[in-house]
Regions:
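Residue-level signature of mid-helix packing/kink "hotspots" within the transmembrane helices
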Residues: 54-62, 146-147
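C-terminal ends and interior cores of transmembrane alpha-helices
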Residues: 82-95
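Paired small-residue
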Residues: 98-106
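Cytoplasmic helix-loop-helix junction between adjacent transmembrane helices
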Residues: 105-142
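Symmetry-related core transmembrane helices of the 12-TM Major Facilitator Superfamily/SLC fold
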Residues: 165-177
Length: 177
């Protein structure tokens, strides 16, 4: 009798943890963005800011998928995490609506690259018969990071301040590398 292959390797768990940290990083700032943007004098741009981030994330996925196939999964995952790390650290330094829009563009791009490369890498390291199960497991970590991130962000903003919350968001992205 053949032993069934497990998807639960160290590499798989590290990818799940990385995706959790990455998703918590970019989602923890979401509830604080409207007030922060308003403090920069850009309350009327809140809808555009959210749309720009989401649109950039979506549009960058096909390109990041091709890039992932061309140069490899790990470099693209690292690129997405590094861009997210830099963006998180720059938010407290931005003092204009235009700068904020540009930053949200790049931050959105990072969320189109990292998860795409991570999903491809999971498919590479998991036996074909277990890929659906593995993608489901990865999805749980992704959804958990995205759902707990805003709670963490609001808590940090309340207890430590917005600047510190942005820096901790940046730290989460760094740890996701």
């Amino acid at each position: 009798m053949q032993k069934e292959e497990s998807i639960y390797s160290l590499a798989f768990w590290l990818l799940c943890l990385s995706n959790f940290l990455f998703c918590a990083s970019f989602s923890m700032i979401i509830p604080e963005l409207p007030d922060y943007l308003a403090s920069l004098g850009g309350r009327e741009y809140i809808g555009y800011i959210i749309a720009l981030f989401t649109l950039t994330a979506g549009l960058s996925r096909p390109f990041s998928g091709k890039l992932t196939d061309h140069i490899g999964r790990i470099p693209v995952m690292a690129f997405g995490s590094i861009v997210c790390f830099i963006c998180g650290g720059l938010y407290p330094l931005i003092h204009s609506v235009q700068g904020f829009l540009l930053l949200r563009f790049f931050h959105g791009m990072s969320t189109g690259t990292k998860p795409t490369a991570t999903a491809a890498y999971v498919a590479d390291i998991i036996p074909e018969s277990k890929r659906g199960e593995a993608q489901g497991g990865l999805g749980i970590f992704t959804a958990t990071g995205m759902s707990i991130g805003p709670v963490i962000g609001s808590f940090l903003a309340e207890e430590l301040g917005l600047r510190e919350m942005f820096w901790i968001s940046s730290l989460f992205a760094l740890l996701s590398i």
